[in-house]
Every structure is written in C-alpha cells, then in structure tokens.
Amino acid sequence: MKRLVLILAITAAAVAVPFAATAAGNEAQKMAMKPVVYTQAVVDLRNAMRMLWEEHIVYTRTFIISALAGLDDTSKVAERLLRNQDDIGNAIKPYYGDAAGTALAGLLRTHILIAADIVSAAKSGDNDGVANGEKKWSANAEDLATFLSSANSNWPKSSLRDMLDIHLAYTTTEVVSRLGKNWAADMEAYDKGHAHMLMFADMLSDGIVKQFPAKFTK
C-alpha cells in the first residue's frame, strides 16, 4: 500500500510539472557531464607535486631493496632519496617562504633517516630497534601533520595524519614482506602505496590552489 501511494504521488508530481521537470533534468544532466577544467598553472603544480612524491615513493622502494640485499648502491640511493626531501621543501617555498620549505625538508629528512634505521634493525632481527624506530616514525608523522596543517587550513591535521600513517603502514609491509620473501605481498604493498602517495600529492596541490587562488588563474 505504501508503495502504491508513493507511485501515485510521484506520478501526480510528474503530471503537474512535466516541462519544469524535464528542463531541470536536462540541466542537471548537462552539469553532470560538464568536464572539470584546470588552468595551466594548476596542471603544472599538480604534475610537479606528483613527480616529487612519486620520486619519494620510488626511491624509498629502491632503498628498501638495496639495503635489505646489501647492494653496493645503497648509500647512493640514500643520498638521492634525501635530496628528494630537499626538493619537496623547495617546492613549497614560493607559497610559504624559505624558512618553511627548509623546515619541511628537515622533517622529511628525519622521516627518511628513521626509515633507514628501521630497515637496518629489521634486517638484523633487532625487534626492539624496529619498535623504537616505529615510535619515532609515528612522532615524526605527528610533527609533519602539525606543521603542514598550521600552514594551510585546507590540510586538516587529522586527514594528514591518516594519510601519513597509511604511507608508513605500506612501507612497513614492503620491508616485512621482502624479508619474508613474500614477493606478492611486497608488490601489492608497493602498488597500493604508490597510488596512495599520488593521492597525497594531489591533496597538497589542491590545498595550495584553494589557499592561493590568485596564483592559479591562468
């Protein structure tokens, strides 16, 4: 009975305003089909930010592989990975100033150095070392989230912290999986972590565009 009443009500409404409903429906359809248009400045920022964070995830991956296998290129990979943190810091200087960029690079360098300690401890079977490193990693993630959220209200601290924690979890899974020679789990963690890092890059780009719209009109 309720279903019948509902059908009758919908039918009555449709008969009463056929032309208005059709017009509204057509307009809604047009809006739904309207593509999102970015200015060139926005595209450039998103591409640059994605490149930087892709390097972050790729060179982190390369370091994990080299360090666990004891390859000769480990120190060189570490140098390149640390340089990426400086590049990310430099990328925000046009918006937040030199001091902020340098501070971000410092926090990210700490993030990488802690990761290196965790990899080393895991490789040697030092469970206490791994646990201690994970505590430091978590504290560093808190510092990063606090720093970034204080610079831009479009980067909520809770969202940043969640994104960073997920990044740490995927990276940890890579290390554990490689040590256990669970190659499928290792690759799955990397693939998901890679996609996640690009989402993080877009989150940062979107926040910058919202905070400084005048810089992205063309």
Task: Identify the meaning behind each predicted range.
Residues 1-8:
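Bacterial N-terminal signal peptides that target proteins for export
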Residues 14-22:
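C-terminal segment of classical bacterial N-terminal signal peptides
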Residues 22-33:
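Cleaved targeting-peptide boundary
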Residues 34, 41-46, 50-67, 81, ...:
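C-terminal amphipathic alpha-helix
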Residues 36-38, 63-74, 89-100:
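Helix-loop segments that flank and shape redox-cofactor active sites
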Residues 76-80:
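Juxtamembrane helix-loop boundaries in multi-pass membrane proteins
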Residues 82-119:
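Mid-chain, structured segments of secreted extracytoplasmic proteins
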Residues 121-123:
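Short, cysteine-centered beta-strand-loop-beta hairpins and adjacent loop/turn segments enriched
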